[in-house]
Regions:
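Conserved donor-binding/catalytic core segment of Leloir-type glycosyltransferases
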Residues: 9-25, 31-34
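Conserved acidic donor-binding segment of nucleotide-sugar-dependent glycosyltransferases
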Residues: 128-129, 133-140, 148-154
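Nucleotide-activated donor-binding/catalytic signature segment of Leloir-type glycosyltransferases, i.e.
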Residues: 58-82
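A structural motif in glycosyltransferase catalytic domains
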Residues: 15, 30-34, 46, 107, ...
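Acidic donor-binding loop of glycosyltransferase active sites
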Residues: 83-99, 112
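Glycosyltransferase donor-sugar binding loop
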Residues: 18, 45-58, 74
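Short acidic/histidine- and often glycine-rich active-site loop of Leloir-type glycosyltransferases
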Residues: 105-106, 119-129, 133-134
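A short, well-ordered alpha-helix in the C-terminal region of glycosyltransferases
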Residues: 156-171
Length: 179
């Protein structure tokens, strides 16, 4: 991390999904949840950053049509990715199937909380309430509620960031910063 010069993103006040785009990542559920979130918080955006085939119809989501979705469907270099993570409110991993995730450890290396689904080892990595929030997979209403709760309670985000910094300081996990 010390050698990476973060690039400031062109967007602000956003929630971040990053990593390879594929059907087991549950991005469509996140887009649907963000449709609900943006009705309540129209100043918040979703950044989806990573390379892969978009496997669902983006046009069905209001966030795509209103500009609340920023899609960076390409390879991101280290500087850009670190900048995106550092400047996000928090990271979301809405996976419908996973064993573990380098995305979580990358977020933690930069002290960012994670909203993740209860699949694979994610609940073990993201201790609910301590480093982020765990929600059931494919549960749009609960995912939207978890996102809204963090947006509306920045002190929760700050407390989670402090927990992550204490338990996962930048020096401990330098080798796994980039997913």
């Amino acid at each position: 991390l010390q050698n990476i010069k973060p690039q400031k993103p062109d967007v602000s006040n956003y929630i971040l999904f990053f990593g390879g785009i594929s059907s087991h990542k549950g991005i469509e559920y996140l887009c649907e949840a963000m449709d609900k979130v943006c009705k309540k918080h129209p100043d918040v955006k979703l950044v989806v950053a990573g390379k892969g085939k978009i496997y669902f119809d983006l046009n069905q989501y209001a966030i795509y049509n209103t500009g609340h979705l920023v899609l960076l469907n390409r390879y991101l270099d280290d500087n850009e990715l670190v900048g995106l993570i550092r400047n996000s409110l928090f990271v979301v991993c809405p996976y419908i199937d996973a064993t573990q995730s380098g995305v979580v450890m990358s977020a933690f290396a930069l002290n960012k909380p994670v909203v993740a689904t209860k699949v694979g080892a994610l609940p073990t990595m993201v201790k609910n309430g301590q480093y982020g929030t765990i929600v059931p997979p494919k549960d749009v209403a609960t995912l939207a509620s978890a996102i809204n709760t963090l947006i509306e309670n920045p002190q929760k985000i700050e407390a989670m960031m402090a927990n992550i910094e204490h338990d996962y300081s930048e020096g401990k996990y330098l080798c796994i910063v980039i997913a």
